UniProtKB/Swiss-Prot annotation:
GO terms for molecular function: 2-hydroxyglutarate dehydrogenase activity; L-malate dehydrogenase (quinone) activity. It is an enzyme of class 1 (oxidoreductase). It catalyses: (S)-malate + a quinone = a quinol + oxaloacetate. Keywords: FAD, Flavoprotein, Oxidoreductase, Tricarboxylic acid cycle. One of its GO terms (biological process) is tricarboxylic acid cycle. The keyword Oxidoreductase applies. It comes from Acinetobacter baumannii (strain AYE). Belongs to the MQO family. The gene is mqo. Pathway: Carbohydrate metabolism; tricarboxylic acid cycle; oxaloacetate from (S)-malate (quinone route): step 1/1. HAMAP family: MQO. This is Probable malate:quinone oxidoreductase.
């Protein structure tokens, strides 16, 4: 027995030593020796998703002569989180997402919903501009009119009524309708009311101007157009393996062709890491001190999906419920109309899954590989402080098919198991951030990372993500290129996004013009709720330059 305990103690000590060695291993890329006369490109985009495609499109419009390179590890672009089946396709506008509004001290706070709604208006303007320029094809190939509905029952009816009363005070939510009449709700969303208990108290709000968006289609179309530019080069099946700074302050991005095994590198003045969940891991390769404050917590999602015409014909809406008390924001249940590659689906979820992968097509070693001496303590602290989240994830992972069907029946009482299949969605990585002098926090939104000189940028986090990609990338341009956005790029940015630098929540006239223009261009449903609509011809509103 003593001998066994001795060996056990030695084993524990060896494991501890190995763990310490692992945590203190160098994670930054080694500097690559490059030739002095080696060409330098203007921008490298890591990842072939909607963020890189959007930023690349901005670049080609603002600087047509820039040399741009895009590297994607899969054999096609838009196959991770941007893929139509890997996300809910919501054009997040704050109309129905009740987690964007909360009641504090008896007052309904709608600022976050206004922020998200304003950002999606930027997205619609960006896409409208691309349609006008012939970059994006027929709008129905990527966006379709789908009303957004918030639906509740029981004790949540009062919450929704208060939410509605607060939201219609903002120009962004003018035109929202509220009802407690089951017959009206059945007209709006028949599936939700079919065979529902007639004694159950229900309520709903509706915004007609809502949309369903295929971000995979947008990504592919933007990249196809970028490929027509001789200054742009896309390499698929290519994994970025290193990002290191050169003595002249440029950066070298090293990569490997996953089909041939060939390695190479490129020198660049600017790097954007738009690799979804893998962004945290890739950012660590830079060795930048400000990158050390980040870690990632991966969470997956599953959806129940049907393409049965008898069901899809009855549902043209995105219906969001309210997350149960104590549940995280990612848990908001919704039953959605989806249009993917010309076919109509109905999707319900999400059901959380857990995996150590940072990408759907990633490795189970991703979480471990991103752990180091700088973030192991914040990760542990956040884990202990968010036991409710851990408990929620465990409960979700333990769900049976019958459990999931019962959840669906809360929103579609007549649902039958044979009509639905379970589909694995994309992988999201929530940010764990430890700022100097502050406690570590788990964040549920998106965050733009920019180095002090703006030469290295990244997008971290998840929701609302793709739906506000044009706004997020515009914000990134401001952080990385402040002089250009205030100077020579300013006029062009106002052409692309007419409301650039304007607060639509405080300018109902401009908001109305913008919505009429984008709805006409994108084929969305919009009837002006403002009595003095200035221009019913849906002409593009005039931009105001700074």
């Amino acid at each position: 027995m003593k001998k066994f305990l001795k060996y056990l103690l030695v084993l524990i000590i060896l494991i501890l030593i190995a763990g310490i060695v692992f945590l203190f291993r160098p994670i930054a890329s080694k500097q690559v020796q490059t030739a002095k006369d080696e060409p330098v490109v203007d921008a490298v985009l890591v990842g072939g998703g909607i963020m890189s495609a959007t930023l690349g499109t901005y670049f080609t419009e603002l600087e047509p002569n820039w040399q741009i390179r895009m590297y994607e590890r899969l054999d096609q672009v838009a196959q991770e989180s941007s893929n139509g089946f890997n996300n809910a396709g919501t054009g997040h506008s704050g109309f129905m997402e009740m987690n964007y509004t909360e009641e504090k001290n008896g007052k309904m706070e709608i600022a976050k919903a206004e922020k998200v709604a304003s950002q999606f208006e930027v997205a619609k303007q960006f896409w409208s501009y691309q349609v006008k320029q012939g970059v994006l094809a027929e709008p129905k190939t990527f966006i379709n009119p789908v009303p957004h509905i918030a639906f509740v029952w029981g004790d949540n009816v009062k919450f929704l009524e208060k939410r509605y009363a607060a939201m219609i005070q903002s120009p962004l939510f003018k035109g929202m309708k509220f009802t407690e009449d089951p017959a009206v709700i059945k007209q709006w969303a028949p599936l939700v009311m079919t065979d529902r208990d007639p004694t159950q108290k229900v309520a709903a709000t509706r915004m007609e101007v809502g949309s369903d968006v295929n971000y995979g289609s947008i990504t592919k179309q933007l990249v196809n157009h970028l490929n027509q530019n001789p200054n742009f080069k896309l390499q698929t099946s290519t994994e970025v393996t290193g990002i290191s700074q050169n003595d002249d302050k440029t950066w070298t991005v090293s990569f490997k062709n996953l089909k041939t095994g060939k390695t190479d590198h490129v020198k660049t003045r600017f790097v954007f890491i738009g690799a979804g969940g893998a962004a945290v891991k890739l950012l660590q390769l830079t060795g930048l001190p400000e990158a050390k404050q980040y870690a990632g917590f991966p969470v997956g999602g599953e959806f129940l999906i049907t393409d049965n015409p008898a069901i899809t014909a009855q549902h043209t809406a995105k219906v969001y419920g309210r997350a149960e008390l104590g549940a995280p924001p990612m848990s908001v249940p919704h039953i959605d109309t989806r249009y993917i590659d010309g076919k109509k689906y109905v999707l319900f979820g999400p059901f959380a899954t857990y995996s150590n992968k940072f990408l759907k097509n990633g490795s189970q070693l991703d979480l471990l590989a991103s752990t180091n001496k700088s973030n192991v303590l914040p990760m542990t602290t956040v884990g202990l402080e968010n036991l409710d989240l851990v408990k929620y994830l465990v409960s979700q992972v333990m769900m049976s098919d019958e459990d999931r069907l019962n959840e669906l029946r809360k929103y579609y009482p007549d649902a039958k198991a044979e009509d639905w299949r379970l589909s694995q969605g994309g992988q999201r990585v929530q940010i764990i951030k430890k700022e100097p002098g502050k406690p570590a926090t788990l964040q549920f939104g998106t965050e733009i990372f920019a180095s002090k000189d703006g030469a290295v940028t990244a997008l971290l986090g998840a929701s609302p993500g793709a739906s506000t990609s044009p706004y997020i990338m515009l914000n990134l341009l401001e952080k990385a290129f402040p002089q250009q956005t205030e100077g020579k790029w300013n006029q062009k940015l106002h052409e692309i996004v007419v409301s650039y630098k304007q607060d639509l929540s405080k300018d109902p006239v401009l908001l109305d013009k913008v919505r009429q223009y984008t709805s006409s261009t994108l084929g969305l449903n919009y009837t002006s709720p403002f009595k003095a609509a200035n221009d019913e011809t849906a002409a593009a509103p005039v931009a105001k330059a700074n």
